[in-house]
Design a protein with these regions (language model features):
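N-terminal pre-domain segments of enzymes
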Residues: 22-37
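Beta-propeller blade-edge and WD-like acidic-aromatic loop motif
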Residues: 21-26, 49, 53-74, 93-94, ...
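Conserved beta-propeller blade repeats
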Residues: 35-53, 80-98, 109, 125-144, ...
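Sec-dependent signal peptide recognition
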Residues: 2-7
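C-terminal motif of bacterial Sec signal peptides marking the signal peptidase cleavage site
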Residues: 14-15
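Serine-hydrolase catalytic core recognition
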Residues: 312-481
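Short, linear, compositionally biased motifs with a strong N-terminal bias
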Residues: 10-11, 69
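Non-catalytic carbohydrate-binding regions of carbohydrate-active enzymes
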Residues: 302, 306
Length: 481
């Protein structure tokens, strides 16, 4: 009797496995590439709309969405060139957007007027222009341009309604501008010396004094100035494995660590009224956002969102609304509105192809395995839903570009297609990858194609240890390495 019960139980288990594998819908590859890609999300002055970039038309164009009604309208009508939203013009429905020609990567800044006519604000043929944000009073915007010398980017500003370029900083020494103070007196400048180190300077545009801020070999990047122009903030990894946030008092030169984590701080900025500090952390291949209420010294808590995690935010000028970018490995990024007064969120876009069921896609997980020398290697793993001991599946080792780089948790159409078709994917973040400390990052210096490649091979060995993998069918895929 006992044997009969055990046998019946095993049959039930196998039957459930077979049923589960049969109930998973498998999709053609074109369905995965019919997802809509969405980026940006910039508030209008009255905070009633958000401008964003979307390829819903088949190519990237500028769109806007009404926050109250949720109605979306297409502002540009390109069918040949990709147009990328940059910002609304203050107190206007006009917009700035960026575009190149024929994929030549020589991007210009365009004005999209309220009547939807356009003006190229940076018209020189070989001029590459990059939007750099607005002045504090929003009467002009800043941008970088190489029109003077195509080797270097100078900093310009352009006044609204005049649209004439005004040179602010001429880059003669290959010192790139990273930030400008509100009074336009101070500039933070950077010059890279290696792939992981740079020199960092404070330039006084009034006295013409150049002060070196970097006081040790490492990485430095700007996190902006205080409103009163007395302090700036920067991110560095000097003396530590992971990047952290510091402040620097301009008059005294006093520096202070104001935030650090067990992972890299990627970026940080203050909200318009300096009520909130936003900090983005690269935590084990995921973006962890920390928003600090500076007045109360507390962390802002967000409501849970089913579609995924919050990857980036933008706080409105009134500091009453937030634009959230929300996505996961099963859902491409969408734009949400978060009302800070009511504590409510509202989904404003839909990026996943409605012909795809997210329940039949796979959530990525972070795994680790030991390489040939015992070093622990992180990886992002996708296990097919139909995989089991009785239904063994093939596998692929996924290799990201390099040197540096990192495969992160997020939505990848090709990966989801392959996993849906029954391929396990192990995206190896081999030694030399970013995000795991500067020692790990430097481990394949002058050694490309040796130890980093062995990490990928040992990733294959890890796959072979999984009892649902067909060990005779393991391949490798990737590019740009």
């Amino acid at each position: 009797m006992k044997r009969l019960l055990i046998g019946a139980a095993l049959l039930l288990i196998y039957s459930c496995e077979d049923t589960a594998s049969k109930s998973i819908a498998q999709y053609d590859i074109d369905l995965f590439f019919k997802n809509i890609s969405i980026g940006g999300g910039y508030f209008s002055s009255d905070e009633s709309k958000l401008a964003f970039t979307s390829n819903a038309s088949g190519i990237y164009n500028v769109y806007e969405v009404d926050i109250n009604s949720g109605e979306t309208s297409q502002r540009t009508q390109s069918d040949t060139e990709s147009f990328y939203a940059l910002s609304y013009i203050p107190n206007s429905n006009a917009l700035l957007y960026s575009a190149d020609k024929g994929g030549n990567e020589i991007s210009h800044i365009y004005l999209l007027k309220e009547d939807n006519s356009t003006v190229d604000l940076t018209p020189e043929e070989t001029e590459k222009a990059r939007f750099f944000g607005w002045s504090k009073v929003r009467t002009c915007f800043y941008y970088q341009s190489n029109k003077r010398d195509e080797r270097f980017f100078d900093l310009y500003k352009m006044k609204v309604d005049e649209w004439d370029p005004i040179l602010m900083y001429e880059n003669q020494q290959n010192l790139s501008v990273e930030s400008v103070s509100n009074n336009e007196r101070y500039f933070l400048l950077s010059k890279y010396t290696t792939t992981s180190t740079n020199d960092f300077y404070l330039f006084d545009n009034q006295t013409r004094a150049l002060t070196q801020v970097s006081d040790g070999a490492g990485s430095y990047s700007s996190a902006g100035f205080s409103d009163d122009n007395t302090t700036f903030f920067f991110i560095t990894d000097v003396g530590k494995e992971f990047a952290y946030l510091k402040s620097y008092e301009i008059e005294s030169g006093k520096q202070e660590v104001i935030y650090e984590s067990d992972w890299d701080v990627m970026y940080s900025y203050l909200s318009e009224k300096e009520t909130y500090r936003v900090i983005g952390i690269n935590e084990d291949g995921r973006t962890n956002l920390v928003i600090l209420d500076i007045n109360n010294d507390t962390e802002v808590n967000f409501p849970e969102i089913q579609d995924g995690s919050i990857n980036s935010i933008s706080i409105s000028k009134s500091e009453e609304k937030m634009r959230l970018s929300v996505g996961s490995s099963k859902n491409p990024s969408n734009i949400y509105l978060y009302d800070m007064k009511s504590n409510r969120t509202k989904k404003l876009t839909q990026s996943l192809n409605p012909e795809l069921n997210a329940d039949h896609l796979v959530a990525a997980e972070v795994v680790r395995f030991s390489s040939f020398d015992g070093l622990e290697i992180p990886a992002i793993y996708y296990k097919p839903l139909q995989a089991s001991k009785r239904n063994k599946v093939p596998a692929l080792v996924w290799v990201h570009g390099g040197p540096g780089g990192q495969t992160r948790v997020g939505y990848y159409s090709l990966i989801q297609y392959l996993v849906n078709q029954g391929y396990a994917i192990l995206a190896v973040n081999n030694r030399g990858s970013s995000g795991y400390g500067k020692s790990f990052y430097k481990m394949d210096d002058r050694n490309h194609g040796d130890k980093d490649l062995k990490d990928c091979i040992w990733g294959k060995k890890w796959l072979q240890e999984q009892n649902y993998i067909d060990t005779d069918k393991i391949g490798i895929i990737g590019g740009s390495y």
